[in-house]
Amino acid sequence: MMQEGGLPRAKKRFGQNFLVQPQIVERIVAAIRPASGDHLVEIGPGPGALTKSLLRLLPQFTVVELDRDMIAGLRALAPPEQLRVLQADALEVDFAALAGAGNALRIVGNLPYNVATPLIFHILEHAEQVRDMHFMLQKEVVDRVVAMPGSKAYGRLSVMIQAYCAVESLFTVAPGNFFPVPKVDSAFMRLIPHRPGLLPPHLQAPFARIVATSFAQRRKTLANNLRGILSADDLRGLQIDPGSRAETLDQAAFFRLAEATVEQGNRS
C-alpha cells in the first residue's frame, strides 16, 4: 500500500521513518565514501533512497530488510548480482557469516529507534569482521554514545560502545527530512572498531557486568553500587575515589575495575 508522495506506507511496529531529503542522502554518501571493493551492507533500506545512490557507486552490495512489503521494490532496483536483498531481522543476522572470507564489512543504515541500541551491540559481537559503521539514530542516542566522562549524557551506553569503537557524531538531521515526520532530531554517526581490540576476550563479560552495576543507580557512589563486589579499600587501591560516581570515571578506570573483579574471582 502506498501513501502520499509515492512512498510505501510506514509501519509503526517497525519504527519506520523514511529519509526523503536527497541532500541528506548525498551527505550520508559523502561521509561513507563507498569504493569499489567495499563489502557494504545496508540495514533497513526501506524504499531505497540511500540504496539508489549506493548503486551508482558500487558494483555489488547487500541490503537487509525486515519488512517483506519492501522486498519486491528493492529487488526491482538492480539485478541480484549487483544488489543482494535479504529479507531478515538484522538482530538475527550472523554478520560474521555475511563477511565470510572477504573484506571486513562496512555497515550503514537508518536504524529504527526501537532497535538501534541492541542492534549495535549485536553487530559488535562480530567487531573483528567489521571495518566501520555509519548509522542514522535518534540524536539523543548519538549524544549518549559519544558523551565524555563528567557530562550529563555519559553513561553505560557511552562506556560500553567506546570500549569497542572510536565514535563520532557527524551531523544532525531535522525531523522534516523524514516521512512520517518523527518527533525528535536524528543524527548521523560513525563507529570504527578498535584495531586491535581494547578488551581481551576474558575481560569482556566482567567489563559489561561492572559497567552495568556501576551505573545501576546513578545517584549512588561507586562504594554503594559496588558493595559486595569491591570494597572501598579495593577502589582506593585502583586509584578510584570510593565516594565518586560512575559518570566521573574514564574508560581506563572501568578497565581496572573489571580486571580487579577477575583477579578477585581467581583468588576465591
Curated annotation (Swiss-Prot):
PROSITE patterns listed in its UniProt record: RRNA_A_DIMETH (PS01131), SAM_RNA_A_N6_MT (PS51689)
Residues that bind S-adenosyl-L-methionine: N17, L19, G44, E65, D89, N110
A Pfam entry, by short name: RrnaAD
Gene3D superfamilies from the UniProt entry: Ribosomal RNA adenine dimethylase-like, domain 2 (1.10.8.100), Vaccinia Virus protein VP39 (3.40.50.150)
Keywords: Cytoplasm, Methyltransferase, RNA-binding, rRNA processing, S-adenosyl-L-methionine, Transferase
Keyword set includes Metal-binding: no
Catalytic activity: adenosine(1518)/adenosine(1519) in 16S rRNA + 4 S-adenosyl-L-methionine = N(6)-dimethyladenosine(1518)/N(6)-dimethyladenosine(1519) in 16S rRNA + 4 S-adenosyl-L-homocysteine + 4 H(+)
Entry EC number(s): 2.1.1.182
Gene Ontology MF, one: 16S rRNA (adenine(1518)-N(6)/adenine(1519)-N(6))-dimethyltransferase activity
Keyword Amino-acid biosynthesis tagged: no
GO terms for cellular component: cytosol
Cell location: Cytoplasm
HAMAP family noted in UniProt: 16SrRNA_methyltr_A
Family in the record: Belongs to the class I-like SAM-binding methyltransferase superfamily. rRNA adenine N(6)-methyltransferase family. RsmA subfamily.
Function text: Specifically dimethylates two adjacent adenosines (A1518 and A1519) in the loop of a conserved hairpin near the 3'-end of 16S rRNA in the 30S particle. May play a critical role in biogenesis of 30S subunits.
Protein name per Swiss-Prot or TrEMBL: Ribosomal RNA small subunit methyltransferase A
Source organism of this protein record: Acidithiobacillus ferrooxidans (strain ATCC 53993 / BNL-5-31)
Source organism phylogeny: Bacteria, Pseudomonadati, Pseudomonadota, Acidithiobacillia, Acidithiobacillales
Gene, per the UniProt record: rsmA
